[in-house]
Design a protein with these regions (language model features):
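Bulky hydrophobic segments
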Residues: 1-132, 150-167
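Divalent metal-coordination and catalytic microenvironments
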Residues: 139, 145
Length: 167
């Protein structure tokens, strides 16, 4: 859940690791999501193809890939700082030796499906009394920016979104 003091000047959009910036093209962007760290980890897993196994029934090689999204809530209970984590985990089998383009498609599908489940989980009755971040538009758009910053080949999508400066 973002707060007013999370708003960051657009001139720092590509250098800060957290905060919110407003862009001309896409509206609010959450810089934490737009870093693409989860996409970077997923890309590495897809490139490495660890534990590839031949499956007779499919006449091909496959390897396991997992992806997750999580949130943490920090609370002080009886004077003790506690952090509670929850999230959504997805595991799939991916055919080995796919082209980089097909691996990017697999990654986007995996990230999008997991993000939808995670945002629904955040929006469930268990959490919506505490946080209003379920199906937060800036989170989903920011996840896409993070994806294209890692898997894309052109200019930085965050710069293409035209972050605004308030100075």
């Amino acid at each position: 859940m973002s707060k007013r003091n999370d708003i960051t000047d657009g001139i720092f959009a590509t250098t800060k690791k957290y905060g919110l910036v407003y862009t001309e093209e896409l509206g609010w962007i959450d810089l934490g999501h737009a870093q693409g760290q989860d996409a970077r980890i997923l890309k590495r897993k897809l490139e490495q193809e660890h534990f590839s196994t031949y499956y007779d029934e499919f006449h091909d090689w496959y390897f396991p890939v997992d992806y997750h999204q999580e949130m943490g809530i920090r609370e002080k209970i009886l004077g003790v700082d506690l952090t509670f984590h929850t999230g959504v985990y997805t595991k799939v089998m991916v055919r080995s030796c796919l082209s980089p383009t097909l691996k990017a498609r697999v990654a986007l599908t995996l990230m999008y499906g997991t993000a939808k489940r995670f945002e629904a989980w955040q929006n469930s009755f268990i959490f919506n009394w505490y946080t209003d971040s379920g199906f937060s538009a800036e989170d989903l758009v920011s996840d896409l920016i993070g994806f294209y910053r890692v898997f894309g080949t052109g200019p930085d999508p965050l710069l293409l979104a035209k972050p605004l400066s308030y100075t």
